[in-house]
Design a protein with these regions (language model features):
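A ligand-binding cleft/hinge motif common to bilobed small-molecule-binding domains
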Residues: 109-124, 175-179, 202-203, 207-241
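Acidic, polar ligand-binding/catalytic clefts
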Residues: 74-156
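Periplasmic-binding protein-like
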Residues: 40, 136-144, 213, 221-261, ...
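Extracytoplasmic small-molecule ligand-binding "clamshell" domains
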Residues: 21-109
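Extended ligand-binding regions for polar small-molecule ligands
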Residues: 25, 58-67, 147-150, 162-163, ...
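Hydrophobic residues within well-ordered alpha-helices
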Residues: 64, 91, 159, 200-202, ...
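Bacterial N-terminal signal peptides
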Residues: 4-16
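Bilobed "Venus flytrap"/periplasmic-binding protein-like clamshell domains
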Residues: 38, 54-67, 138-183, 189-192, ...
Length: 291
């Protein structure tokens, strides 16, 4: 019986998928390939159009790979329930659900000290095997509105009378349904995503849409309607309203982080990153680190 148990254990181990290994910088250079994880179907940052990869993060990843003298290999990452899950699945442990793929670099990760230092109930760093670095974008909340039905947005209080569209389960959703003791909840309409909210505004179901600035800029660019305007209102009682977006590598791969950060700074200072954002109608503010 003991021998049978050992044999079963050996067979079980043999049937498990091979654990993906983190490549170091020298191995990546020798392979001539930079594997970069980008979020799937997340316009304007990473998406496919007519079978061709497009988006800000895709173009920036291409520019970084070129600066390192290697080719780009994209890993399309469906967004998980939490960013912690995405970092685990694509940077340090891999997942059988994603074919055991590990990226050398992951785009669109918050560059935030508090998040990087987040600890679990045992006091351990939740993302201790990850280095977050290289801020390349400032992000914030933005409202776009249709001037045919709304003269201006001096305050979010106008959405007590005017319907506004938001993505379901998003920060704007929670904010608009709770601020001012919930007085805006009745006029807050929920949609599967920002494109659907914009389509609803075009159809006259809502007079405005609230989302991240980059997504709003992209939709305004795609809509190409001069009557769709950008609001300049404040968001009282919202908490953090401006944050930076960067990248992530495995904590053992700091050499890659240094090389990528050096390449990124060059691209920012020469205006290449701003040009990439312009391809998709996005405004670009240089992150504080490079000012």
């Amino acid at each position: 019986m003991r021998l049978l148990a050992v044999l079963i254990s050996v067979l079980w181990l043999c049937c498990q998928p091979a654990q993906a290994q983190v490549r170091n910088y020298d191995e990546m250079i020798a392979a001539g390939e930079l594997k970069v994880a980008v979020y799937k179907d997340f316009a304007p940052y990473s998406f496919e159009s007519a079978g061709k990869p497009q988006g800000v993060d895709v173009e920036l990843a291409e520019a970084l790979a070129k600066a390192l003298g290697v080719r780009l290999s994209l890993i399309w990452a469906p967004a998980g329930e939490k960013l912690d899950d995405d970092l685990r699945d694509y940077i340090w442990r891999a997942s059988a659900l994603h074919n055991q793929q590990l990226a050398d670099l992951m785009m669109r990760v918050p560059y935030d000290h508090d998040y990087a230092q987040k600890r679990n109930e045992l006091g351990e760093l939740v993302n201790g095997q990850v280095v977050m670095f290289g801020p390349y974008q400032n992000e914030q909340w933005q409202v776009a509105y249709d001037r045919r039905r709304l003269d201006k947005v001096a305050s979010v209080a106008v959405f007590e009378q005017h319907p506004i569209g938001v993505e379901v389960d998003s920060v704007p959703s929670f904010y608009l349904t709770s601020v001012f003791n919930g007085m805006l909840a009745g006029k807050t309409h929920h949609y599967p995503g920002v494109p659907q909210a914009f389509a609803a505004m075009k159809a006259g179901e809502v007079d405005a849409v609230m989302a991240m600035r980059g997504e709003i800029d992209w939709q305004v660019h795609e809509t190409a309607d001069p009557q769709v305007a950008l609001a300049e209102n404040a968001y009282p009682n919202m908490g953090k309203q401006l944050w930076e977006i960067g990248m992530a590598v495995h904590e053992s791969n700091r050499q890659l982080a240094y090389a990528v950060e050096e390449a990124l700074e060059g691209l920012i200072r020469e205006g290449a990153v701003k040009t990439i954002y312009g391809h998709y109608g996005l405004r670009y503010d240089v992150p504080e680190m490079y000012q």
